[in-house]
């Protein structure tokens, strides 16, 4: 992998490539608390609702720590925060850092193997991919993945994997038709960008497992995150091959930063990220003639199927 494509692709110093162990640094301790959020509390007759993690603060603390250390635990917190703030593109870039330093600095990456024991590293992966059936599993990242938008129509609306699952599990045919209409009304370039990002994430997960396999000290259980991303991929593969139209691609400079995706650039270690921004859907807003044509076609199809 070309380290120049990574935000933190350099070593901290020549004498100490991965810096110092920040396990007891106040910033690390704050990260470990912030990632949990605050559970629901009861004070007398009052119920104080649970508070989700403050991803802005988590990203800030993790970024600060990465100036001084190369620590798998910090990279995982940083990856989760990037997913929360930037979508699948953030997840991919975080995984690329994890892969790069696991491959290039196996003996120096914190926490360092303890006489061949990498259990501390394997345990750190549980935040990204909790073990199925574990009663105390942290499902934070899983919930973030389920909320990622997979189709985004300016008129019909945006739908996530959670929405798609719910429509399938409840047998809600109306919801399924709306999701299909939203897919057909989504710009083809952006759909392709998300699919490419998904493919690259899956490749990165495979490469991380292979890296740990090759060292023979234990392999992280990445089945849950892999299965969810594969489910996203399956959604796209099950959709119609033809789009209603092919709108002009949106440049990164013209579109929002959130939920950016990547263009393909496969290497053995991972893939270089070339961001392609995804649109933030604004229901009811048409941006030009092509939007209007696609919307009319999608609506006509919906009426034909539902009100012949």
Identify the role of each PLM range.
Residues 1-114, 123, 131, 140, ...:
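N-terminal domain-start signal
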Residues 111-293:
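Mid-to-C-terminal functional-domain signal that highlights helix-capping/loop sites
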């Amino acid at each position: 992998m070309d380290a120049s494509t990574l935000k933190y692709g350099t070593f901290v110093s020549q004498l100490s490539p991965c810096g110092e162990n920040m396990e007891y640094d106040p910033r690390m301790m704050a990260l470990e608390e912030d990632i949990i959020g605050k559970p629901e509390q009861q004070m007398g007759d009052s119920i104080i609702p649970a508070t989700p993690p403050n991803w802005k603060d988590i990203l800030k603390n993790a970024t600060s720590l990465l100036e001084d250390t190369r620590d798998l635990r910090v990279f995982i917190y940083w990856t989760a925060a990037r997913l929360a703030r930037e979508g699948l593109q953030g997840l991919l870039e975080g995984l690329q850092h994890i892969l790069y330093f696991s491959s290039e600095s196996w003996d120096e990456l914190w926490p360092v193997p303890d006489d061949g024991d990498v259990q501390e590293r394997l345990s750190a992966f549980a935040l990204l991919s909790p073990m199925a059936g574990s009663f105390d599993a942290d499902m934070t990242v899983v919930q973030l993945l389920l909320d990622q938008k997979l189709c985004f129509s300016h008129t019909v609306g945006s739908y996530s994997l959670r929405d798609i699952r719910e429509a399938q599990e409840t047998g809600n045919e109306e919801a399924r038709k709306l999701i299909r209409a939203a897919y057909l009304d989504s710009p083809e370039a952006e759909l392709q960008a998300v699919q490419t990002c998904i493919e690259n994430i899956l490749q990165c997960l495979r490469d991380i497992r292979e890296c740990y396999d090759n060292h023979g000290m234990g392999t992280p259980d990445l089945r849950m995150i892999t299965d969810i991303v594969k489910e996203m991929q399956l959604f796209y593969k099950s959709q119609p091959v033809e789009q209603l139209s092919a709108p002009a691609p949106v440049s990164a400079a013209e579109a929002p930063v959130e939920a950016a995706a990547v263009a393909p650039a496969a290497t053995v270690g991972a893939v270089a990220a070339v961001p392609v921004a995804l649109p933030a859907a604004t229901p009811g807003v048409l941006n030009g003639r092509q939007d209007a044509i696609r919307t009319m076609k999608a609506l006509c199809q919906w009426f034909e199927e539902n009100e012949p």
